């Protein structure tokens, strides 16, 4: 029984590591966003609803992927939450009237299209996805 448990834990840890290694994301913004780079703390503040602007004063509106490895990698890397905790914190903000839930879109192409056509929009997509018409922000 112990051996089976150890094998299960090892495989679970390996699969989580594999997902994190495969899911590399880039942060994109509408061309109206002044900054060419963004800090991890700015991203966390924007995507948790704590702030609606970057340090340079650019007003931004976050847009999300509905789910998947890239979504999970972004939340883990830049927000420090899993999807369940992330959505719960947003529901709390929405319920208390402090914020509106960010748009969640199906797929990288939809996120790129939305960000390209909406001033101040900021989102994330898979690193290998086409991203013409949007600005790629360097995360520092």
Residue spans for each PLM region:
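Positively charged n-region of N-terminal signal peptides that target proteins for export
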Residues: 1-4
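Alpha-helical transmembrane segments of integral membrane proteins
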Residues: 6-7, 60
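Sec/Tat signal peptide C-region and signal peptidase I cleavage site
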Residues: 16-23
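Exported/periplasmic ABC-transporter solute-binding proteins
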Residues: 24-140
């Amino acid at each position: 029984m112990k051996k089976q448990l150890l094998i299960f834990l090892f495989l679970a840890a390996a699969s989580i590591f594999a997902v994190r290694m495969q899911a590399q994301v880039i942060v994109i913004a509408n061309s109206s966003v002044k900054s060419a780079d963004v800090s991890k703390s700015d991203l966390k503040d924007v995507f948790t609803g704590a702030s609606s602007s970057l340090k340079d004063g650019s007003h931004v509106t976050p847009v999300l992927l509905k789910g998947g490895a890239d979504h999970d990698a972004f939340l883990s890397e830049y927000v420090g939450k899993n999807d369940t905790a992330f959505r719960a914190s947003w529901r709390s903000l929405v319920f208390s009237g402090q914020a509106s839930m960010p748009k969640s879109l199906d797929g990288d192409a939809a996120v790129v299209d939305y960000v390209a056509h909406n001033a101040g929009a900021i989102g994330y997509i898979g690193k290998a996805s086409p991203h013409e018409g949007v600005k790629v922000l360097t995360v520092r």
